Every structure is written in structure tokens, then in C-alpha cells.
A protein has these predicted regions:
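Short, surface-exposed beta-strand/loop micro-motifs that present aromatic residues
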Residues: 169-176
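Beta-strand-turn-beta hairpins that frame and shape the catalytic cleft
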Residues: 141, 176-180
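Extreme N-terminal starter segment of soluble prokaryotic enzymes
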Residues: 1-5
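Pocket-forming structural segment of enzyme catalytic cores
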Residues: 90-167
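Acyltransferase
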Residues: 183-209
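An anion/phosphate-binding loop that grips the pyrophosphate of nucleotide cofactors and donors
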Residues: 40
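Cysteine-nucleophile active-site neighborhood
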Residues: 49-120
Length: 209
């Protein structure tokens, strides 16, 4: 079996994501090398922070094309938090174009009375692709851990894999299209449910090898 690459582009602490993957049964390789991404059997793109620095850091490391090629080649791919948002065409938070792998935009939560932004803490997922391999073994409407002020708004509603409701706003919490999966919440901070999701991804990686 080859290796799973966790992309390091200076956007947040990769330690907890890697620890979660190790618990799920795989030893990830942290890398910012285009060649590693080309050779990897599967890819995880984590990240916390702001949209513009994230895409700038990816492009300055020449990682945009290897990421696009890996997804096009059918390699299992998991984006986490900011790693979901930069797959889209752009963000209300910044001016830089995103990777544009998924059509749509990243939007900010609308202000509401008594609504806290960022959306932070435990909240329930509602599955929109309930048969997704990533969700295997989870109870319906599981609680996972969120920290975000922006959410993705895909043009094609069929890429939605789960939604979450914050105040009166129900927004995308996860997307899935073929081998490409990405989540707004933090599986590595989501206790048993998060570990189950990472384990499901690792199972897909092993089945794909």
C-alpha cells in the first residue's frame, strides 16, 4: 500500500488531524511536495484560518495542479474546514480565486438576533447523502464539532452530503462527489463520531489501493 498525504501549507495545526488518522489505522505523511501529492494514494487537506492566505500558500508551493490532478485521477480526497472552502470558486471573505473544483461560493452567516458568529461548538448533522461511505456506522443526526463564520454554497445541490442548522440558517456541512469528500466540521475534534468518519475514509483508502 502507498501512503496518505496530509497537505501542509501553513494553515493551522496538522497534529490533531494526523493523530485522528493514526487512531483510524493509517500513518499519514505530512508534506508540501507536489511530487508527494502526485505519488500519494489518497490526500487529506486540512486547514483553519482565512481564505486568501490559504490559496496563496497553496499556489506559492505549486500545489494547485497536483491537487486537481489527484482528484481527477480518482484518489480518495478529504478536505477539512478551510480545506473544504478553498475547493470552491471564491469567498466573501477574500478576493483570491479558489481552486474552483466545486462550483459555488463561500458565504458568511447572516447576522440574526442572539446568533453567535462564529458558529462554534457541537451541532447535529442532517445527512443529505445518507448512503455515503463516509457516514457508515454513525447514528442519524450525529453531533460533530464546528468552528466557522463562513459556509460553502454549492451551485449543484446534489453535491451536498450533509447540512447543519445554525439559528434559522441551514447550510452545507459536507459535500461529496465520487472520490472527493470534504467537511466543514472538525472530525479530529468530534470524539467517537469524528473517529468513525476518519476510519471510514481510511477504509476507502485501503479498498482503493
Amino acid at each position: 500500500m502507498g501512503f496518505l498525504a496530509v497537505i501542509d501549507y501553513d494553515m493551522g495545526n496538522l497534529h490533531s488531524a494526523c493523530k485522528g488518522l493514526e487512531k483510524a489505522g493509517i500513518q499519514p505523511k505530512i508534506t508540501d511536495s507536489p511530487q508527494d501529492i502526485a505519488e500519494a494514494e489518497a490526500i487529506v487537506l486540512p486547514g483553519v484560518g482565512s481564505f486568501d492566505p490559504a490559496v496563496q500558500h497553496l499556489r506559492s508551493r505549486h500545489l494547485e495542479e497536483p491537487i486537481k490532478q489527484a482528484i481527477a485521477a480518482g484518489k480518495p480526497f478529504l478536505g477539512i474546514c478551510l480545506g473544504l472552502q478553498i475547493l470552491f470558486e471564491g469567498s466573501e471573505e477574500g478576493k483570491e480565486p479558489g481552486l474552483g473544483i466545486i462550483k459555488g461560493k463561500v458565504r458568511r452567516f447572516q447576522s440574526e438576533p442572539n446568533l453567535t458568529i462564529p458558529h462554534m461548538g457541537w451541532n447535529q448533522l442532517q445527512f443529505t447523502q445518507s448512503n455515503l461511505s463516509l457516514w457508515q456506522g454513525l447514528t442519524p443526526d450525529p453531533y460533530v464539532y464546528f468552528v466557522h463564520s463562513y459556509y460553502v454554497d454549492p451551485v449543484d445541490p446534489n453535491v451536498n452530503a450533509a447540512v447543519v442548522t445554525h439559528g434559522s440558517q441551514t447550510v452545507t456541512a459536507a459535500i461529496a462527489r465520487d472520490n472527493l469528500m470534504a467537511v466543514q466540521f472538525h472530525p479530529e475534534k468530534s470524539s467517537d463520531n469524528g473517529l468513525q468518519i476518519l476510519s471510514n475514509f481510511v477504509t476507502m483508502v485501503k479498498q482503493n489501493s
